[in-house]
A protein has these predicted regions:
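Active-site environment of divalent metal-dependent phosphoester hydrolases
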Residues: 13-16, 43-48, 70-81, 115-120, ...
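Active-site neighborhood of phospho(di)ester-bond hydrolases with catalytic His/Asp-centered motifs
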Residues: 6-8, 35-40, 64-70, 112, ...
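Short acidic, glycine-rich surface-loop motifs adjacent to enzyme active sites
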Residues: 141-156
Length: 269
């Protein structure tokens, strides 16, 4: 079995330092095999925010895979935004914008969907898709295949279609053919679990599309939260841990279980 902590939209600069410590404590207790961070580590891509994010990560002694979000690109510094958009991210977090994690049970591929030309929304291009496909297709058939982006492949009910990852349909067609099982994203500050089959309707393919909420003060009506995934093919459970201020703990609010079938992943609870 593999355990992944899926954390997104930390937004250092808009994160209570006391809560950051509680998040670290919760993650240490879980002791995940991988920490997956799906972007927006900072609020305005400032040096001090990246330094705080790096210190936060360095205190967690677990393998990690990180991708940038749109807030990790400078907003007000026009030169930096268009010429060196991810220079601070690459200096302080990781130089790798196409990270890959592999072990005996899963392969996890990260994609940079942040773009200088858009303020909020993101995009995936054909070259990136081909690179992800290459990694996914090269794995044994029983290995779980996971893709991590900041911008989402699916949307919770009521969210405008404009918030969807740019060129998502093109990407999903090819990633489905490569056997993608699971998509992790953030950006919306809303928790969500969906099936790719509901939106994309690709015959014989139904991947899980999972959104993490935010732990920052930039909430959208939800309490600070993150996800814990427990993966043991053909089963995946997804737990949502939510901050309970009265008890000063992250507690499980919801758990969903899924089972893999000939047509993809289906809910089993």
């Amino acid at each position: 079995m593999r355990v992944i902590v899926h954390l997104s939209d930390i937004h250092f600069g808009r994160l209570d330092p006391a809560l950051a410590a509680r998040i670290q404590q919760a993650i240490v207790r879980i002791a995940p095999d991988l920490l997956a961070l799906s972007g927006d580590l900072t609020q305005r891509a400032r040096k001090r925010e990246f330094l705080a994010a790096r210190a936060f990560l360095d205190a967690l002694p677990f393998p990690r895979l990180v991708v940038p979000g749109n807030h990790d690109v400078p907003l007000h510094n026009v030169f930096a935004r268009f010429v060196t958009p991810l220079a601070r991210y690459q200096r302080f977090i990781t130089s790798d914008l196409s990270p890959v994690y592999r072990d005996e049970e899963m392969v996890v591929v990260g994609v940079n969907t942040a773009r200088s030309l858009t303020v909020g929304e993101g995009r995936i291009n054909a070259r990136q898709v081909l690179e992800v496909v290459r990694h996914l297709k090269g794995e044994p058939p029983d290995r779980i295949r996971i893709v991590v982006t900041h911008h989402p492949f699916d949307l919770p009910e009521g969210v405008k279609e404009a918030r969807l990852l740019g060129r998502a349909r093109m990407a999903m067609t090819q990633l489905a053919a490569a056997g993608a099982d699971l998509f992790l994203a953030g950006h919306l500050h809303l928790s969500h679990i969906g099936h790719s089959a509901e939106r994309y309707k690709i015959a014989g393919h139904s991947a899980l599309v999972v959104q993490a909420g935010t732990v920052s003060t930039r909430s959208r009506g939800e309490q600070p939260s993150f996800n814990v995934l427990r993966i043991e093919r053909p089963n995946i459970s997804i737990e949502r841990l939510v901050w309970v201020a009265e008890r000063e703990v992250f507690a499980e609010e919801a758990a969903s279980a899924f089972h893999h079938t000939a047509n993809g992943w289906v809910r089993s609870n």
